[in-house]
């Protein structure tokens, strides 16, 4: 009998600063395994082993998600949550951690989570996994990690995984998701830009997130770095969109020099705040400028699209009353946020 870590626990292991590097070098297994472990064994033996493996105290580990074969009875406890999988586990979707413990690979983890969240939330999860952050219960509300998977890898071919019920949902959720996001606001802005109009977005050319702009020797005299990263930009555009959040004023001098260096390279910066995105006239002007930079145009929305857009905005952006004067946001964390012990 083996322990197959799944769902939220698998996501946290891949993205936790305490374990992500170990998960990244774990080896795939080729053959099937016996996923018929008992709940008693998970609680008494595997949880202590997992605590030792991750360095997280047993009392802080939380409830562990794990997979069982469909024909095995599930008996959840306060310490563990069993989930069933229909049919044999697919090849090369599990990573061996030793001691008969296996971790669901990133794309398999994402497929498991497809049954828990809607398309908008799944797109946000995909961009967090393929980006550099995960919402966290820690002090800053974000935990940093290297990308654990690419969006292309999440768009798994059906032949890799079989005709599982979540495949269509995964394909739809990753259709407009992008790599390389560094924050929830970059994710929200990107999804607003390229989600189709009929789903509430603006249906514009897909942006590039955090594109590297290498500086000339002359510009490096102004801003002594090899390159700058632009938060959001259209392909081959000289207009760069920068999210202006709470942290902006902490390095004001550095950002002024950075902006001057980028201007010398021929780029123009358009700053975007959360309050602007919440204000329809300002948001539409930002989208109009993005469309123009991409060689596109902004079409007026129909009544149906307006209703869809309001619904999408409610999913992607906080309520206006939760935005603080300094740009901070009072917002509840999603169910997939990294627990504080894992941060």
Residue spans for each PLM region:
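Short gly/ser-rich loop at a beta-strand->alpha-helix junction or flexible surface loop bordering the NTP-binding
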Residues: 1-165, 301-303, 310-343
């Amino acid at each position: 009998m083996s322990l197959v870590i799944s769902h939220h626990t698998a996501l946290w292991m891949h993205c936790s600063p305490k374990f992500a590097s170990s998960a990244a070098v774990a080896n795939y297994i080729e053959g099937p395994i016996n996923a018929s472990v008992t709940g008693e064994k998970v609680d008494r033996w595997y949880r202590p082993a997992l605590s030792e493996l991750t360095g997280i105290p047993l009392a802080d580990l939380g409830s562990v998600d794990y997979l069982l074969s469909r024909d095995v009875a599930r008996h959840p406890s306060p310490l563990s949550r069993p989930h069933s999988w229909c049919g044999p586990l697919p090849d090369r979707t599990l990573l061996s951690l030793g001691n008969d413990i296996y971790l669901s690979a990133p794309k398999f983890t994402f497929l498991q989570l497809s049954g828990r969240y809607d398309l908008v939330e799944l797109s946000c999860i995909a961009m967090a996994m393929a980006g550099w952050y995960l919402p966290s219960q820690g002090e800053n509300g974000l935990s940093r990690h290297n990308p654990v998977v690419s969006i292309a890898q999440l768009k798994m071919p059906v032949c890799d995984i079989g005709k599982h019920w979540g495949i269509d949902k995964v394909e739809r959720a990753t259709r407009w998701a992008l790599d390389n996001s560094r924050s929830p606001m970059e994710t929200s802005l990107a999804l607003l830009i390229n989600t189709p109009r009929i789903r509430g977005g603006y249906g514009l050319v897909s942006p590039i997130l955090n594109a590297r702009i290498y500086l000339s020797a002359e510009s490096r005299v102004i801003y002594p770095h090899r390159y700058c990263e632009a938060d959001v930009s259209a392909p081959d555009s000289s207009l760069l969109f920068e999210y202006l959040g709470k942290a902006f004023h902490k390095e004001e001098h550095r950002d002024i020099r950075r902006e001057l260096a980028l201007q010398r390279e021929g780029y123009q910066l358009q700053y975007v705040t959360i309050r602007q995105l919440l204000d329809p006239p300002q948001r539409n002007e930002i989208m109009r400028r993005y469309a123009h930079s991409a060689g596109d145009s902004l079409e007026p929305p129909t009544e149906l699209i307006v209703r869809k857009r309001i619904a999408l905005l409610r999913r992607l952006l906080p309520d206006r009353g939760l935005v603080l004067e300094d740009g901070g946001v009072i917002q509840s964390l999603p169910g997939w946020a990294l627990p504080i012990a894992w941060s």
